[in-house]
Regions:
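Bacterial N-terminal signal peptides that target proteins for export
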Residues: 1-8
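N-terminal signal peptide c-region/cleavage motif recognized by signal peptidases
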Residues: 13-15
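Charge-biased low-complexity segments
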Residues: 19-314
Protein backbone atom coordinates (compact mmCIF):
# COMPACT_ATOMS: atom_id res chain seq x y z
CA UNK A 1 0.00 0.00 0.00
CA UNK A 2 1.33 3.45 -0.82
CA UNK A 3 2.33 5.90 1.89
CA UNK A 4 -0.49 8.22 0.90
CA UNK A 5 -3.37 5.75 1.25
CA UNK A 6 -1.79 4.31 4.40
CA UNK A 7 -1.95 7.80 5.92
CA UNK A 8 -5.66 8.06 5.01
CA UNK A 9 -6.49 4.85 6.85
CA UNK A 10 -4.56 5.97 9.93
CA UNK A 11 -6.41 9.29 9.91
CA UNK A 12 -9.79 7.58 9.78
CA UNK A 13 -9.00 4.86 12.31
CA UNK A 14 -7.95 7.08 15.22
CA UNK A 15 -9.30 7.30 17.82
CA UNK A 16 -9.92 3.59 17.45
CA UNK A 17 -13.29 1.91 17.84
CA UNK A 18 -14.04 -1.80 17.84
CA UNK A 19 -15.99 -3.07 14.84
CA UNK A 20 -16.28 -6.33 12.94
CA UNK A 21 -13.20 -6.65 10.75
CA UNK A 22 -15.09 -7.76 7.66
CA UNK A 23 -17.26 -4.64 7.55
CA UNK A 24 -14.35 -2.32 8.30
CA UNK A 25 -12.24 -3.91 5.57
CA UNK A 26 -15.00 -3.13 3.07
CA UNK A 27 -15.05 0.49 4.24
CA UNK A 28 -11.25 0.69 3.92
CA UNK A 29 -11.47 -0.30 0.28
CA UNK A 30 -13.75 2.66 -0.43
CA UNK A 31 -11.67 5.26 1.41
CA UNK A 32 -10.68 8.25 -0.67
CA UNK A 33 -9.30 11.70 -0.03
CA UNK A 34 -10.02 14.96 -1.71
CA UNK A 35 -9.55 18.68 -1.55
CA UNK A 36 -11.81 21.49 -2.68
CA UNK A 37 -10.15 24.03 -4.97
CA UNK A 38 -11.89 27.31 -5.78
CA UNK A 39 -11.23 29.98 -8.35
CA UNK A 40 -12.69 31.63 -11.43
CA UNK A 41 -13.13 30.43 -15.00
CA UNK A 42 -13.69 32.39 -18.22
CA UNK A 43 -15.36 30.76 -21.22
CA UNK A 44 -14.95 31.92 -24.83
CA UNK A 45 -17.98 32.60 -27.06
CA UNK A 46 -17.32 29.24 -28.76
CA UNK A 47 -17.45 27.39 -25.42
CA UNK A 48 -13.72 26.73 -25.05
CA UNK A 49 -11.89 27.81 -21.90
CA UNK A 50 -10.40 31.29 -22.25
CA UNK A 51 -8.59 31.15 -18.92
CA UNK A 52 -8.89 30.45 -15.22
CA UNK A 53 -7.42 31.41 -11.86
CA UNK A 54 -7.06 29.40 -8.64
CA UNK A 55 -7.48 30.82 -5.16
CA UNK A 56 -4.40 30.55 -2.93
CA UNK A 57 -2.42 28.65 -5.54
CA UNK A 58 0.61 28.66 -3.22
CA UNK A 59 -1.27 26.43 -0.75
CA UNK A 60 -2.02 23.73 -3.32
CA UNK A 61 0.20 20.69 -4.02
CA UNK A 62 2.00 21.07 -7.38
CA UNK A 63 0.43 17.82 -8.62
CA UNK A 64 -3.05 19.27 -8.05
CA UNK A 65 -2.22 22.54 -9.80
CA UNK A 66 -0.82 20.64 -12.80
CA UNK A 67 -3.79 18.28 -12.92
CA UNK A 68 -6.28 21.15 -12.97
CA UNK A 69 -4.39 22.90 -15.75
CA UNK A 70 -4.31 19.77 -17.91
CA UNK A 71 -7.98 19.03 -17.19
CA UNK A 72 -9.42 22.47 -17.89
CA UNK A 73 -7.68 22.87 -21.24
CA UNK A 74 -9.81 20.00 -22.56
CA UNK A 75 -13.14 21.39 -21.37
CA UNK A 76 -15.85 22.60 -23.73
CA UNK A 77 -19.03 24.38 -22.59
CA UNK A 78 -22.30 25.25 -24.23
CA UNK A 79 -21.71 28.84 -25.43
CA UNK A 80 -23.05 31.36 -22.92
CA UNK A 81 -25.46 33.74 -24.65
CA UNK A 82 -26.37 37.29 -23.69
CA UNK A 83 -29.39 38.67 -25.56
CA UNK A 84 -29.13 35.68 -27.90
CA UNK A 85 -25.47 36.26 -28.78
CA UNK A 86 -22.56 34.10 -27.53
CA UNK A 87 -20.20 36.15 -25.38
CA UNK A 88 -17.16 35.74 -23.13
CA UNK A 89 -18.49 34.76 -19.71
CA UNK A 90 -16.97 34.37 -16.25
CA UNK A 91 -18.07 32.23 -13.31
CA UNK A 92 -16.99 31.30 -9.82
CA UNK A 93 -15.55 27.77 -10.03
CA UNK A 94 -15.27 25.08 -7.38
CA UNK A 95 -13.54 21.76 -8.10
CA UNK A 96 -13.35 18.55 -6.07
CA UNK A 97 -10.00 16.82 -6.69
CA UNK A 98 -10.07 13.19 -5.51
CA UNK A 99 -7.19 10.81 -4.73
CA UNK A 100 -7.73 7.05 -4.82
CA UNK A 101 -5.61 3.94 -4.56
CA UNK A 102 -5.38 1.95 -7.81
CA UNK A 103 -3.28 -0.93 -6.53
CA UNK A 104 -0.57 -1.63 -3.96
CA UNK A 105 1.93 0.57 -5.79
CA UNK A 106 -0.09 3.33 -7.44
CA UNK A 107 -2.37 6.21 -6.49
CA UNK A 108 -4.29 8.45 -8.89
CA UNK A 109 -5.86 11.88 -8.65
CA UNK A 110 -8.58 13.35 -10.82
CA UNK A 111 -11.16 16.13 -10.94
CA UNK A 112 -14.39 14.32 -10.09
CA UNK A 113 -16.93 17.09 -9.55
CA UNK A 114 -17.30 20.76 -10.36
CA UNK A 115 -19.70 23.59 -9.66
CA UNK A 116 -20.08 26.95 -11.38
CA UNK A 117 -21.92 29.78 -9.70
CA UNK A 118 -21.96 33.53 -9.27
CA UNK A 119 -19.21 35.49 -11.04
CA UNK A 120 -17.44 35.97 -7.71
CA UNK A 121 -17.83 33.98 -4.51
CA UNK A 122 -18.90 37.10 -2.60
CA UNK A 123 -21.87 37.85 -4.84
CA UNK A 124 -24.29 36.00 -2.55
CA UNK A 125 -23.35 37.86 0.64
CA UNK A 126 -25.74 40.54 1.98
CA UNK A 127 -23.10 43.28 1.66
CA UNK A 128 -22.74 42.51 -2.05
CA UNK A 129 -26.51 42.46 -2.55
CA UNK A 130 -27.39 46.03 -1.66
CA UNK A 131 -29.62 46.12 -4.74
CA UNK A 132 -31.37 42.95 -3.50
CA UNK A 133 -30.54 41.04 -6.68
CA UNK A 134 -29.18 37.98 -4.83
CA UNK A 135 -30.41 35.30 -2.48
CA UNK A 136 -28.92 35.80 1.00
CA UNK A 137 -29.28 34.22 4.43
CA UNK A 138 -31.37 36.00 7.05
CA UNK A 139 -31.29 33.11 9.50
CA UNK A 140 -29.08 30.03 9.39
CA UNK A 141 -29.26 28.16 12.69
CA UNK A 142 -26.62 25.42 12.98
CA UNK A 143 -27.76 21.81 13.45
CA UNK A 144 -27.54 19.94 16.73
CA UNK A 145 -24.66 17.44 16.78
CA UNK A 146 -26.06 13.99 17.76
CA UNK A 147 -24.51 13.24 21.18
CA UNK A 148 -23.75 9.60 20.45
CA UNK A 149 -21.79 10.60 17.35
CA UNK A 150 -19.77 13.12 19.34
CA UNK A 151 -18.94 10.41 21.89
CA UNK A 152 -17.81 8.09 19.07
CA UNK A 153 -15.70 10.84 17.42
CA UNK A 154 -17.77 10.63 14.24
CA UNK A 155 -17.23 13.57 11.91
CA UNK A 156 -18.33 14.13 8.35
CA UNK A 157 -19.96 16.41 5.80
CA UNK A 158 -23.63 16.48 4.82
CA UNK A 159 -24.52 17.93 1.42
CA UNK A 160 -28.03 19.38 1.39
CA UNK A 161 -30.28 20.52 -1.43
CA UNK A 162 -32.63 23.26 -0.22
CA UNK A 163 -35.57 24.71 -2.13
CA UNK A 164 -36.44 28.29 -1.13
CA UNK A 165 -39.85 29.77 -2.01
CA UNK A 166 -40.70 33.39 -2.79
CA UNK A 167 -41.40 34.07 0.89
CA UNK A 168 -37.81 33.16 1.72
CA UNK A 169 -38.86 29.99 3.53
CA UNK A 170 -37.57 26.47 2.97
CA UNK A 171 -40.23 24.58 1.02
CA UNK A 172 -38.24 21.36 0.50
CA UNK A 173 -34.96 19.95 1.76
CA UNK A 174 -33.15 16.69 1.05
CA UNK A 175 -29.79 15.04 1.68
CA UNK A 176 -27.81 14.53 -1.51
CA UNK A 177 -24.73 12.87 0.05
CA UNK A 178 -23.02 12.23 3.40
CA UNK A 179 -19.27 11.56 3.61
CA UNK A 180 -17.91 10.21 6.92
CA UNK A 181 -14.47 10.54 8.49
CA UNK A 182 -14.70 7.31 10.50
CA UNK A 183 -14.21 3.66 9.67
CA UNK A 184 -16.94 1.18 10.60
CA UNK A 185 -19.03 -1.60 9.11
CA UNK A 186 -21.71 -0.77 6.56
CA UNK A 187 -24.60 -0.90 9.01
CA UNK A 188 -22.94 1.57 11.36
CA UNK A 189 -21.97 3.90 8.51
CA UNK A 190 -25.57 3.93 7.26
CA UNK A 191 -26.84 4.76 10.74
CA UNK A 192 -24.38 7.63 11.16
CA UNK A 193 -25.24 9.04 7.73
CA UNK A 194 -28.93 8.87 8.56
CA UNK A 195 -28.49 10.65 11.91
CA UNK A 196 -26.32 13.44 10.51
CA UNK A 197 -28.68 13.87 7.57
CA UNK A 198 -31.74 14.12 9.80
CA UNK A 199 -30.06 16.67 12.08
CA UNK A 200 -29.07 18.75 9.06
CA UNK A 201 -32.54 18.73 7.49
CA UNK A 202 -34.18 19.63 10.79
CA UNK A 203 -31.96 22.70 11.09
CA UNK A 204 -32.44 23.71 7.46
CA UNK A 205 -36.23 23.77 7.76
CA UNK A 206 -35.90 26.73 10.16
CA UNK A 207 -33.68 28.80 7.87
CA UNK A 208 -34.87 32.06 6.29
CA UNK A 209 -33.62 33.95 3.24
CA UNK A 210 -34.01 37.32 1.59
CA UNK A 211 -34.98 36.64 -2.01
CA UNK A 212 -34.01 38.63 -5.13
CA UNK A 213 -36.21 41.67 -5.74
CA UNK A 214 -34.26 42.97 -8.73
CA UNK A 215 -32.14 41.45 -11.48
CA UNK A 216 -32.60 38.38 -13.68
CA UNK A 217 -33.74 36.08 -10.83
CA UNK A 218 -36.39 38.40 -9.40
CA UNK A 219 -39.24 36.68 -11.27
CA UNK A 220 -38.35 33.12 -10.27
CA UNK A 221 -40.88 31.23 -8.15
CA UNK A 222 -38.21 29.30 -6.22
CA UNK A 223 -34.45 28.86 -5.85
CA UNK A 224 -32.34 25.74 -5.30
CA UNK A 225 -29.49 26.24 -2.83
CA UNK A 226 -26.71 23.69 -2.32
CA UNK A 227 -25.37 23.67 1.25
CA UNK A 228 -22.54 21.60 2.78
CA UNK A 229 -22.67 21.17 6.56
CA UNK A 230 -19.45 20.10 8.23
CA UNK A 231 -19.51 18.15 11.51
CA UNK A 232 -16.21 18.12 13.41
CA UNK A 233 -15.17 16.94 16.88
CA UNK A 234 -12.58 18.57 19.12
CA UNK A 235 -10.60 16.05 21.17
CA UNK A 236 -10.87 17.00 24.85
CA UNK A 237 -7.66 18.36 26.32
CA UNK A 238 -5.98 18.86 22.95
CA UNK A 239 -6.05 21.31 20.06
CA UNK A 240 -6.91 18.49 17.64
CA UNK A 241 -10.11 18.93 15.65
CA UNK A 242 -11.30 15.83 13.78
CA UNK A 243 -12.84 16.74 10.45
CA UNK A 244 -11.51 20.24 9.71
CA UNK A 245 -8.85 20.14 6.97
CA UNK A 246 -7.60 23.49 5.76
CA UNK A 247 -7.55 24.79 2.21
CA UNK A 248 -5.09 22.81 0.11
CA UNK A 249 -5.07 19.88 2.56
CA UNK A 250 -6.31 16.37 1.82
CA UNK A 251 -9.57 15.39 3.52
CA UNK A 252 -9.83 11.62 4.12
CA UNK A 253 -13.30 10.05 4.29
CA UNK A 254 -15.56 7.15 3.40
CA UNK A 255 -17.77 8.51 0.59
CA UNK A 256 -21.49 7.98 0.83
CA UNK A 257 -23.86 7.24 -2.05
CA UNK A 258 -25.35 10.13 -4.03
CA UNK A 259 -29.10 10.11 -3.44
CA UNK A 260 -31.31 10.92 -6.41
CA UNK A 261 -33.84 13.54 -5.32
CA UNK A 262 -37.07 13.55 -7.39
CA UNK A 263 -37.52 17.34 -7.35
CA UNK A 264 -33.81 17.82 -8.09
CA UNK A 265 -33.19 14.94 -10.49
CA UNK A 266 -33.00 17.02 -13.67
CA UNK A 267 -30.24 19.20 -12.20
CA UNK A 268 -28.40 16.19 -10.78
CA UNK A 269 -28.32 14.39 -14.13
CA UNK A 270 -27.26 17.54 -15.98
CA UNK A 271 -24.39 18.32 -13.61
CA UNK A 272 -23.11 14.76 -13.11
CA UNK A 273 -23.90 15.00 -9.38
CA UNK A 274 -21.74 17.85 -8.13
CA UNK A 275 -22.92 17.95 -4.51
CA UNK A 276 -19.46 17.64 -2.99
CA UNK A 277 -18.02 20.47 -5.12
CA UNK A 278 -19.96 23.10 -3.18
CA UNK A 279 -17.79 25.29 -0.92
CA UNK A 280 -18.78 25.92 2.69
CA UNK A 281 -18.13 29.67 2.77
CA UNK A 282 -21.26 30.77 4.61
CA UNK A 283 -23.09 32.00 1.51
CA UNK A 284 -25.98 30.36 -0.37
CA UNK A 285 -24.60 28.63 -3.46
CA UNK A 286 -26.80 28.73 -6.55
CA UNK A 287 -25.46 27.02 -9.66
CA UNK A 288 -25.31 29.17 -12.80
CA UNK A 289 -27.40 27.22 -15.30
CA UNK A 290 -25.68 28.96 -18.23
CA UNK A 291 -22.46 27.00 -17.67
CA UNK A 292 -23.09 23.52 -19.08
CA UNK A 293 -20.02 21.32 -19.55
CA UNK A 294 -20.21 19.29 -22.77
CA UNK A 295 -16.97 17.30 -22.42
CA UNK A 296 -16.23 14.68 -19.75
CA UNK A 297 -15.48 16.26 -16.39
CA UNK A 298 -12.03 14.68 -16.19
CA UNK A 299 -10.93 16.10 -19.55
CA UNK A 300 -7.47 15.03 -20.67
CA UNK A 301 -6.11 15.24 -17.14
CA UNK A 302 -8.19 12.50 -15.57
CA UNK A 303 -6.56 9.81 -13.47
CA UNK A 304 -2.98 11.03 -13.20
CA UNK A 305 -1.03 8.11 -11.72
CA UNK A 306 1.66 8.39 -9.05
CA UNK A 307 3.73 5.19 -8.68
CA UNK A 308 4.30 4.32 -5.04
CA UNK A 309 4.31 7.92 -3.91
CA UNK A 310 2.32 10.65 -2.25
CA UNK A 311 0.53 12.82 -4.86
CA UNK A 312 1.40 15.90 -2.87
CA UNK A 313 1.49 17.27 0.65
CA UNK A 314 -1.50 18.81 2.27
Amino acid sequence: MTRFVWWLLVALAAPALAFAHGGVDAAKRSVEASMLVTGEIAVNPDGSVYGYSLDHRDKLPPAVVNLIGQTLTGWKFTPVKVNGKPELAKAFMSLRVVAKQIDAKHDAISVESAAFGAETAAANTPSACADRSCLAYIKRSPPSYPHNLVNDFVSGTVYLAVEVNRQGKVSQVAVEQVNLRRLADGTMLDRWRRELGQASMEAARSWAFSVPQTGPEADMDHWIVMVPINYSVRVTGTSEVIGMPGYGQWDAYVPGPVNLIPWLQKRQLATNGNADAIPDNGTPFIADARFVLLTPLGGDGAGKIFPGANPGPG
